[in-house]
Amino acid sequence: MQNFHPRHFAIVPAAGSGSRMGSERPKQYLPLLGKPLIYHTLSVLCAAPEIDKVFVVLSVGDAEWGRHDWRALGPKLVPLFCGGPTRADSVLAGLRAIAGEAVQSDWVLVHDAARPCLAPWHIDKLVRELAGDEVGGLLAVPVADTLKRADGHRHVAATVPRDSLWQAQTPQMFRYVMLRRALESATDVTDEASAIEAAGLRPRLVQGDATNLKVTYPLDLHLAEWILNNRTGVQQ
């Protein structure tokens, strides 16, 4: 029977090591305002009324998860210890793990564990704007800076026109079966939208904002802390 009321599942790949942070601890567990970084990410997803369940995909040997108390996030949160060596592997493993629960018409929102400044209005806007879309899409922001293409010696080879260029963010939201098939067929993709594009489809860009940053380098932790400390709960 067709599901006329599709559900929304979040998948958070969190099996990476975060080597660019220069820390022995995986970056998703680095402290941020007294909690693991990923706690802030999961908290927003679990509190979102649009989201039915939140699946966090961890590495098989993750020993850090059990050292923290996640009970305050409620029953929506489900850890899956099936992560792979790449983001795409982890997302695909998560999709396969929930095959008994998700149906073809359900939506899946994939969100970076290292984007702890996701806000409720980001989720609300994404879900509302993509509700009737045949493909799905992703949060993104127009590129503001001038871009330079470098040669092999770090000299400027060309200036890249920034017109029509967008910086991809997450969540990225697609139908369950469409996303699973795209990832099963794709090779060398860095995000879900790339896999959907490789399948010949065109994801929609939903404009987000710069506060939804990804923590990649140590300075980003300080920026994330500032954003969370100064957030009012009302979209600016």
From Swiss-Prot:
Site (Positions MEP for the nucleophilic attack): residue numbering on this chain: R162, K214
Superkingdom of this protein's organism: Bacteria
Gene3D superfamilies per UniProt: Spore Coat Polysaccharide Biosynthesis Protein SpsA, Chain A
NCBIfam families: ispD
Swiss-Prot/TrEMBL site (Transition state stabilizer) positions: R20, K27
E.C. designation(s): 2.7.7.60
The species this protein was found in: Azoarcus sp. (strain BH72)
Keyword entries, A-Z: Isoprene biosynthesis, Nucleotidyltransferase, Transferase
General function of this protein: Catalyzes the formation of 4-diphosphocytidyl-2-C-methyl-D-erythritol from CTP and 2-C-methyl-D-erythritol 4-phosphate (MEP).
Catalyzed reactions per annotation: 2-C-methyl-D-erythritol 4-phosphate + CTP + H(+) = 4-CDP-2-C-methyl-D-erythritol + diphosphate
Protein name: 2-C-methyl-D-erythritol 4-phosphate cytidylyltransferase
Family under the similarity heading: Belongs to the IspD/TarI cytidylyltransferase family. IspD subfamily.
